[in-house]
Regions:
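Short cytoplasmic-facing helical segments at TM-TM junctions of multi-pass membrane proteins
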Residues: 155-193, 221
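N-terminal signal-anchor/first transmembrane alpha helix
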Residues: 7-38
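Transmembrane alpha-helices
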Residues: 138, 142, 175-207, 235, ...
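Loop-to-helix entry region at the N-terminal start of transmembrane alpha-helices
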Residues: 69-77, 127-148, 186, 191, ...
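C-terminal transmembrane helix and the adjacent membrane-cytosol boundary/short C-terminal tail
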Residues: 100, 234-265
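Periplasmic/extracellular loop-to-transmembrane helix junction in inner-membrane transport proteins
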Residues: 10, 16, 40-83
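Hydrophobic alpha-helical transmembrane segments of multipass integral membrane proteins
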Residues: 25, 30, 68, 72-96, ...
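Cytoplasmic-entry segments and transmembrane alpha-helices of multi-pass inner-membrane transporters
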Residues: 91-127, 140, 150-154, 165
Length: 265
């Protein structure tokens, strides 16, 4: 028994190690190609700084609090816009998923609005809300709202009709049907929407800050670009990527914890 459990434990460890190696192969290749291009002179360090210079800049900006301050400002904007998008998107998504009249009423208009690129909303929102926080929060809301809404509607609509019939047989009221049948069925799809919405909102806030802001990681990158401080630009890009990956992993973990019945699928 002891040898069997030890073998299984080692086997699981090896599988996880292979998965990890598989995941980091491409990033390692990119870093090596970057180093090769700058060290051999294949690319000018004026347009592509050496990776050692970028890492030194990253260390310096983390040390003096510049980078953490910028990221903190951007994340605070996301917290407001994303939270609002999640609440409105899920509530309206549930309504549209469970009510055909509501679905027909909203869907055409929402589909049309979804086709408008986020970047096109920025000047309009600046006109409406000014260059302050409200315009950035509105951009984030619009970016995150539709992925959450669409995936919530999809999850509700894909609920097994047999389960709905069972609910009717047991005379479950509307709230009981929602909590015991529709919600468990829709949660995996809802979390897909939450994940997509968070990813898009992170990109949206960076883009909005580049166009109309005096603070945040997007502003810092654009400001450094105008001053030709390219190591700062690349340090900011790396920070954006790292924070984005952390947020993606966090929402994936929360999704797995909230939908344990999906583990075996």
């Amino acid at each position: 028994g002891g040898y069997v459990s030890m073998y299984k434990g080692n086997n699981v460890f090896i599988q996880k190690l292979l998965i990890f190696i598989n995941m980091i192969i491409l990033p390692v290749i990119i870093v090596l190609a970057w180093h090769f291009a700058t060290s051999t002179g294949a690319m000018s360090t004026l347009i592509l700084p050496k990776i050692s210079t970028v890492l030194e800049t990253l260390k310096e900006q983390l040390g003096n609090g510049t980078l953490t301050g910028d990221i903190g400002i951007s994340l605070s904007r996301i917290a407001k816009g994303y939270a609002l998008a999640v609440v409105v998107g899920i509530l309206l998504g549930v309504l549209m998923g469970m009510n055909k009249f509501a679905n027909r009423f909203f869907m055409l208009t929402f589909t049309a609005i979804r086709q408008i690129p986020m970047i096109a909303w920025v000047p309009i929102l600046i006109i409406w809300f000014g260059i302050g926080e409200e315009s950035k929060v509105a951009v984030i809301f619009l970016a995150a709202y539709f992925p959450v809404l669409v995936n919530t509607v999809s999850g509700i609509e894909r609920t097994d009709p047999k389960l709905i019939e069972v609910g009717k047989m047991y005379h479950l009221n509307c709230w009981q049907q929602f909590t015991k049948i529709y919600l468990p069925s829709a949660l995996p799809s809802i979390f897909v929407g939450l994940k997509l919405g968070l990813s898009v909102s992170w990109m949206a806030v960076v883009g909005a800050e580049m166009i109309a802001a005096t603070s945040g990681i997007g502003f810092r990158i654009n400001d450094a670009r105008s001053l030709m401080q390219y190591p700062v630009v690349f340090a900011g890009i790396i920070a954006i990527a790292v924070v984005g990956v952390i947020m993606d992993l966090a929402i994936s973990l929360i999704g797995k914890l909230c939908t344990p019945w999906e583990k075996g699928r």
